[in-house]
Amino acid sequence: MNPIIISMIGFTIILGTTIVLMSSHWFMIWIGFEMNMLAIIPVLMKSHHPRSTEASTKYFLTQTTASMLMLLSVMINLIYTGQWTAMKLANPTASTIMTLSLAMKLGLSPFHFWVPEVTQGIPLTSGLILLTWQKLAPLSVLYIASPNLNMTMLLTMSILSVVMGGWGGLNQTQLRKILAFSSIAHMGWMTAIIMFNPTLTLLNLLLYILMTTTIFMILIFTKSTTTLSISYMWNKTPIMTVIMLTILMSLGGLPPLSGFMPKWMIIQELTKNNNIALALIMAMSALLNLYFYMRLMYATTLTMFPSSNNIKMKWYYTNNLPTKYLPTLTIMSTLLLPLTPMMMMLLN
């Protein structure tokens, strides 16, 4: 692709998200979403493969439907209240439709089916953008409008997302699908706590982006897309394999790694607000995620026979990408748990 076109597309993606993040006017928020969506389509289709085309079409149809629902919600609210302000979503019907729209954009259950399919059909770099950067705009709108949204519906979808995110990843062998289901589960955790402590949602989002970015960087570095290719990584880059499996454990919320911090704080916040049943359901559902990560680790480390490197691997004779950012990201993705008391003090 032409470097000028790549620069224009990247600038439009960043500009669209920035407009959403900085706007309090519903029409400008909608325009930002549309700019971002139209610019991300060529990024998803850059491999010129039929699967990429199919994934891009699914993404386009889903996001277009969500944008239509958002515009419908804004119009209903405008008719009843005369307000364009994002913080004033007073009409119950508009509030319900807006909740559905944002859930569809984030990939919350039961609107989650597009996330694994789209992630599986696109290249790793596009998957990284889809599962990290593309979550910023809808979550920022959810953060702003959360006091006016249908919280019963949002909590129900959050619980379903945590359950389906763990359940859907159980029998997967494709790493992109595993990370997609992990994204669904993490979105469930973030939206569950947003009505009690919105700042905790931002902390969870930050750690999720850190861990997901680190894993995708390792997958891009080694060109690994399946669980079998991780097993072959032992012969080429054993240290990188250990790092990736450790970060997967962190993503699953295993103490004493960084990923345990947001789950600990969210469960503590839910119990503090007398939502013990909700905290129990989410904690039990998180075990599903941890199970398929541990199964992946077990299959990679303990079920492979010791072997010499007699297999010509895809990355063996290619120039490897530089990894100058990887040590910092790895440390932040695994060793932030001791900062939990300070985070609790800042967020309370």
UniProtKB/Swiss-Prot annotation:
Pfam family, one: Proton_antipo_M
First-level EC class: translocase
Gene Ontology biological-process entries: mitochondrial electron transport, NADH to ubiquinone; mitochondrial respiratory chain complex I assembly
Annotated localization: Mitochondrion inner membrane
GO CC annotation: mitochondrial inner membrane
Primary location recorded for the protein, binned into one broad class: mitochondrion
Protein name according to UniProt: NADH-ubiquinone oxidoreductase chain 2
Entry EC number(s): 7.1.1.2
GO molecular-function terms, A-Z: NADH dehydrogenase (ubiquinone) activity
Transmembrane segments: 3-23, 25-45, 59-79, 93-115, 149-169, 178-198, 201-221, 239-259, 276-296, 326-346
Reactions this protein catalyses: a ubiquinone + NADH + 5 H(+)(in) = a ubiquinol + NAD(+) + 4 H(+)(out)
Record keywords, A-Z: Electron transport, Membrane, Mitochondrion, Mitochondrion inner membrane, NAD, Respiratory chain, Translocase, Transmembrane, Transmembrane helix, Transport, Ubiquinone
Subunit structure: Core subunit of respiratory chain NADH dehydrogenase (Complex I) which is composed of 45 different subunits. Interacts with TMEM242.
Originating species: Thyroptera tricolor
InterPro entries: Complex_I_Subunit_2, NADH_DH_su2_C, NADH_UbQ_OxRdtase_chain2, ND/Mrp_TM
Family as reported in the entry's similarity comment: Belongs to the complex I subunit 2 family.
Known function: Core subunit of the mitochondrial membrane respiratory chain NADH dehydrogenase (Complex I) which catalyzes electron transfer from NADH through the respiratory chain, using ubiquinone as an electron acceptor. Essential for the catalytic activity and assembly of complex I.
Membrane topology listed for this record: Multi-pass membrane protein
UniProt xrefs under PANTHER family: NADH-UBIQUINONE OXIDOREDUCTASE CHAIN 2
